Structure formats: C-alpha cells, structure tokens
C-alpha cells in the first residue's frame, strides 16, 4: 500500500523550532513528528510513502533517505513549485498513487494520535466507496469544521464550519484513505480538499466517517505540542510502560533518552521528555516540558510548560514557564525569569522576559 503525507507547509505556528528544521522533522517525544507517522504506516503494511514537499525539502530528503534504508520501504518526494493546498498535491502525485488500483492513505503532517491504519483499510473496503475520513471527538466543536454522518453506516451527510449552535462534536482528524477514483475529481491547481472536494463527495454518497478510538492532537503550535506530548506519554504508559523512566526524583510519565545525563536531587515530571545528549545538572525541577537533543539545564533551574530547542543552555536558578519556547542554540543567562517567551535561534538572553513576547 501507499501513503501520501502533506509536508509542504512553512510551519509558521511552530516557530521558532521550524526556523531550524521543517515541521515534520521537529522532535516530538524524542523522534521527528514525521517518523511517528511513517513507522505507524509501515506497521500497517505500507511499502511506499510519498512526501508532498516544498519548504526545506533538501533536509527532509536527506533524513528520509536514511529512514528508507532503515525501514526497508520506498520513500518518494513530490515537489510543489507553488502551494497547492490540501488537494492539489494528490493531483501532482497522481502517477505514483496510481501505480496500482489499491486504496492509499493521505495524512496531514501535524497529526499525532493512536493511528488506526488497519481499521481504516477494513472499514474502507467494507463500504466500498471512494473515501474514508477519520473523525475524532472534541470538547469545543465551535473552533472547528464538524462532520455530520449517519451513526450506523458512517455515511457523511454534510460538513458545518465552526458551528455556533451544537450540531456535532466530531471533527475531521486529517487522516484519510481513498480509492484511486478520487483523483478524477482533483485538478492540478491550488485546491482545498476539505472545502471543495469533500462536500461534493458527501452529496454523492461517496464519503464515509470512521470514529477514532484513542487520543488525537494537532500539534502544529507550541501549547498543543505540549498537550499532545502529555497524551502521547499516557498512551506509552498503557502500551509500553517499560519505555518510561522511573526512579528517585521522577514522577508520572517521563521519557528519557539513554544518552542523557541527570544530576542529583532533581525533580522531574510529570509529563517530561528529555532527548539525546541532554545534561540536567543538580537540583533542577522540570514539569510538562520537552527538552531537545544536546541541551543543558544548569543547576537549580525551574521549568514548567516549556520547550527547550536543540543545543540550548538554560542558566542556574532560571525560571521558565507559560509555554516558553527556546529555538535552537539559545543561551539563557543565570537567574532570569522567562514567562511565555518565544526566543529565536542563536540568541543570548541577558534580561528577564516578564510578559509573553517574541525575542528576535
């Protein structure tokens, strides 16, 4: 089977991390976001992954060449010369997608969840129509486009964009499976699959919904990235508890790379990921944070709800909170307070940031 992953966006909502690498290569729980998706696809029997690329495509290509060998699959690049929206990339990759008559997966690149790829194949073959959308239940449907469908069959009747009164709490999760016939509906031009293609398919009875069991998060911006991390760690707790770190000073779900060094008298967790080559000095407190590869947290620093980008350094007695994000190679001097700071790569911070703002 094949899968197309839409990785062409600029990832502006996840800056400053995406100023160093394209969003699909940002480390989420110690592994690039894209790799979480690709590994789940391979497990479900996908042998050919196509990446619809534009921004920083060289970096993606280099990383995925290595993964191609490791996973023993074929990975192709489909290069967009101009932004083609969410449907145009399907038309661009048409030749690759129609090498056989099998259905194929399409994924948005920001989605992290309990990927239900095997269930999708079964359900899609069962109803035999052109398309299947995975839907997920949300608390606040008024922020999204919701999907209205028959509970018994899953046949989608219509879509309602950001409803002000309650009509449904199921939204499009950004995971699809299509039969090749769907490509006859899509032209090679900028097109929105959600607004231009899906409503017509639904009218013709060609689109079905499968409800996701398990967690789901669009991790395209820092606060959702951290929420998604908490959900993912809870899922690891259920499925692979042996991967979580336990011991004195550790609380709740904590993922620590074996190459990281942790000092004495630290308090780490709940909901923390510590990447490869990270050094955490004595007396550090970390809660609900992602600490990326090669970073150093100096003694007695206190971090909550923050993301520390690759190779950054946080000084002694620093306090960071409220979705503070450090880009790559940032230095925070000793005894400073960062509240909701968004710090661009290669900066040195020498004074406190008491109110949320971008440091350029």
Swiss-Prot record:
GO terms for biological process: GDP-mannose biosynthetic process; protein glycosylation. The keyword GTP-binding applies. Pathway: Nucleotide-sugar biosynthesis; GDP-alpha-D-mannose biosynthesis; GDP-alpha-D-mannose from alpha-D-mannose 1-phosphate (GTP route): step 1/1. InterPro entries: GMPPB_C, GMPPB_N, Hexapep_transf_CS, Mannose-1P_guanyltransferase, NTP_transferase_dom, Nucleotide-diphossugar_trans. GO terms for cellular component: cytoplasm. CDD domains: M1P_guanylylT_B_like_N. It comes from the Eukaryota. The keyword GTP-binding applies. Pfam families: GMPPB_C (PF25087), NTP_transferase (PF00483). GO terms for molecular function: GTP binding; mannose-1-phosphate guanylyltransferase (GTP) activity. Belongs to the transferase hexapeptide repeat family. Catalyzes the formation of GDP-mannose, an essential precursor of glycan moieties of glycoproteins and glycolipids. This is Mannose-1-phosphate guanyltransferase beta-B. It comes from Xenopus laevis (African clawed frog). The gene is gmppb-b.
């Amino acid at each position: 089977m094949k899968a197309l992953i839409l990785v062409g966006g600029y990832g502006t909502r996840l800056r400053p991390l995406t100023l160093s690498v394209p969003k699909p290569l940002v480390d989420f729980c110690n592994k690039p976001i894209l790799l979480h998706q690709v590994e789940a696809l391979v497990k479900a029997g996908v042998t050919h992954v196509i990446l619809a690329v534009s921004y920083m495509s060289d970096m993606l290509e280099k990383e995925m060449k290595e993964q191609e060998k490791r996973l023993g699959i074929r990975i192709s690049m489909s290069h967009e010369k101009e932004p083609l929206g969410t449907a145009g990339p399907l038309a661009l990759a048409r030749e690759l997608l129609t090498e056989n008559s099998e259905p194929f997966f399409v994924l948005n690149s920001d989605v992290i969840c309990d990927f239900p790829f095997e269930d999708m194949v079964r359900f899609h073959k069962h109803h035999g129509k052109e398309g299947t959308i995975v839907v997920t239940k949300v608390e606040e449907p008024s922020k999204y486009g919701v999907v209205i469908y028959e509970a018994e069959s899953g046949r989608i009747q219509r879509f309602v964009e950001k409803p002000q009164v309650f009509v449904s709490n199921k939204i499009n999760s950004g995971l699809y499976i299509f039969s090749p016939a769907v490509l006859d509906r899509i032209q090679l031009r900028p097109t929105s699959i959600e607004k231009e293609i899906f409503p017509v398919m639904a009218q013709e009875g060609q689109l079905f919904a499968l409800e996701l069991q398990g967690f789901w998060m669009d991790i395209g911006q820092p606060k959702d990235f951290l929420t998604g991390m908490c959900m993912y760690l809870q899922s690891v707790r259920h499925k692979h508890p042996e991967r979580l770190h336990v011991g004195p000073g550790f609380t709740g779900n904590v993922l620590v790379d074996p190459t990281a060094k942790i000092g004495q008298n630290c308090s780490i967790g709940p909901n923390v990921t510590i990447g490869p080559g990270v050094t955490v000095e004595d007396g550090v407190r970390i809660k609900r944070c992602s600490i990326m590869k090669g970073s150093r947290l100096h003694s007695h620093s206190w971090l909550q709800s923050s993301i520390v980008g690759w190779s950054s350094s946080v000084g002694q007695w620093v306090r960071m909170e409220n979705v503070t994000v450090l880009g790559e190679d940032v230095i925070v001097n000793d005894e400073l307070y960062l509240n909701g700071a968004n710090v661009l790569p290669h900066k040195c911070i020498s004074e406190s940031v008491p109110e949320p703002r971008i440091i350029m």
